[in-house]
Amino acid sequence: MKVILLEELEGRGSFGDIITVKDGFANNYLIPRKLALPATEGNIKHIQSILSQKARKLEKIRTQAQELAKKLDGAEITIKKPVGQNGKLFGAITTSDIAKALNEKGFNVDKKQIIISSPIKNLGLYTIKVRLHNDIYASIKVNVEEQK
């Protein structure tokens, strides 16, 4: 029996794939658990429309991420923090601080998108990567200065 998968089945396929399985497996397991639908013409058209909607939505998100990457690439933000006697910061600059500074400049960036290996604890200029989509990154410069 041919069925259309509604969820990923390990070793069998992913959403929208049409696979052939034994009738008993389809009727007693896949279809009752809403893991698959019978591969009728109507069901195939329905799943294809869902897949095309998902593809359009993903393309729109990707385009928005590319536009943001163009605007964000090379942007410079300045963060001022109090400094101790030895030139080290009190506390550290974290992804939250960087995201807040970017949002104040009008860039809609979440702290989870900012990639730093460890919190910044010294004054200076740092280049930070921002992951906007699966494979779309932007580089920004973060200038850490002494708060007076």
Curated annotation (Swiss-Prot):
The lineage of its organism: Bacteria, Pseudomonadati, Aquificota, Aquificia, Aquificales. GO terms for biological process: translation. Keywords: Ribonucleoprotein, Ribosomal protein, RNA-binding, rRNA-binding. Belongs to the bacterial ribosomal protein bL9 family. One of its GO terms (cellular component) is ribonucleoprotein complex. This is Large ribosomal subunit protein bL9. The keyword DNA repair does not apply. Binds to the 23S rRNA. HAMAP family: Ribosomal_bL9. Pfam families: Ribosomal_L9_C, Ribosomal_L9_N. GO terms for molecular function: rRNA binding; structural constituent of ribosome.
